């Protein structure tokens, strides 16, 4: 299998190592990223396991034990037990470890069809924030973030921004003693598809070949969801877009490019203020 070191590759196959790449933007540094205070805890089910499975319960128990939980985090291949957050890098690693050559080829071919906006990292960011943030983030927050990243190409910034928003939402719920709602896996897939459409299609039609590639990619990321259900979700989305039923929703949820750029400047200013204080 070919080891890919850059997104724009001439090979028709993407190895798992592609998904493990750390994100670095030459125009930014780690010092400009928002620093998160301790105390953040989030239950992550996503594509990793079913919400009520025995392994979920066991991981929560193990994670609550100080010494055993620490050892489990060190030796676990997948990393993260109990209520730990699966960050974007870990998410990509897990997806890459489970991807088949056909799965990797689908990511590559999708990029070839959609151009830069269809880069695998963009697709995976949409899947990650849907898997992790559903129930904590508003749909508008997800769509605004994935739309920004298609313009700025700063995935690390958006990851940290999403985490900050989830942290804030989690803390608000903790103060009110309210648990985050349990979001079915099928709805997480729908959220992921909404993000991919906003980021990669820019209100264009979802063609038949796109549907096939989306099905392969979403099954690779969300294997616990029935293939027929994922196919239904994609088909219904494509039909709504073709019939114009999504136009009003897209116009209401997506911000103009200028507004997004202003929003990014505001976020960067607030980050700098936090660092200086």
Swiss-Prot record:
Segment annotated as transit peptide: 1-45
Any one Gene Ontology BP term: photosystem I assembly
Membrane topology category: Peripheral membrane protein
Single GO cellular component term: chloroplast stroma
Keyword Phosphoprotein: no
Mutant phenotype after disruption: Seedling lethality when homozygous. Pale green and slow growing phenotype when grown on MS medium supplemented with 2% sucrose.
Places the protein is found: Plastid, Chloroplast; Plastid, Chloroplast thylakoid membrane
Keyword Protein biosynthesis: no
Keywords: Chloroplast, Membrane, Plastid, Thylakoid, Transit peptide
Function: Nuclear genome-encoded factor required for the accumulation of photosystem I (PSI). Functions as a PSI biogenesis factor. Cooperates with PYG7 to promote the stable assembly of PSI in the thylakoid membrane. May target primarily the PsaC subunit. Does not seem to be required for the expression of chloroplast genes encoding PSI subunits.
Subunit structure of this chain's protein: Interacts with PYG7.
UniProt-recorded name of the protein: Photosystem I assembly factor PSA3, chloroplastic
Species: Arabidopsis thaliana (Mouse-ear cress)
């Amino acid at each position: 299998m070919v080891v890919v070191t850059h997104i724009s590759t001439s090979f028709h196959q993407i190895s798992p190592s592609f998904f493990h790449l750390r994100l670095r933007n030459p125009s930014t540094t780690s010092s400009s990223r928002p620093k998160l205070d301790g105390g953040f805890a989030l239950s992550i089910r996503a594509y990793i396991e079913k919400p009520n499975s025995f392994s979920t319960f066991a991981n929560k128990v193990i994670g609550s034990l100080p010494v055993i939980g620490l050892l489990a985090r060190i030796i676990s291949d997948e990393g993260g037990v109990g209520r730990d957050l699966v960050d974007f890098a870990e998410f990509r690693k897990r997806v890459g470890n489970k991807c088949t050559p056909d799965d990797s080829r689908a990511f590559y071919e999708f990029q070839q069809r959609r151009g830069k906006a269809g880069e695998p990292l963009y697709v995976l960011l949409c899947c990650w924030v849907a898997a992790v943030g559903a129930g904590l983030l508003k749909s508008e927050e997800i769509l605004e973030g994935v739309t920004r990243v298609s313009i700025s190409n700063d995935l690390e910034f958006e990851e940290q921004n999403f985490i900050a928003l989830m942290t804030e939402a989690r803390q608000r719920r903790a103060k009110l003693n309210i648990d985050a709602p349990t979001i079915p896996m099928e709805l997480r897939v729908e959220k992921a598809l909404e993000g991919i459409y906003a980021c990669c299609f820019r209100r264009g039609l979802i063609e038949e070949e796109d549907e096939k590639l989306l099905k392969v990619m979403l099954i690779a990321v969300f294997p616990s969801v029935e293939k027929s259900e994922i196919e239904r979700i994609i088909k219904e989305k494509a039909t709504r877009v073709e019939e114009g039923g999504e136009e009003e929703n897209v116009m209401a949820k997506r911000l103009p490019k200028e507004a997004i750029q202003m929003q990014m400047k505001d976020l960067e200013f607030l980050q700098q203020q936090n660092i200086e204080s």
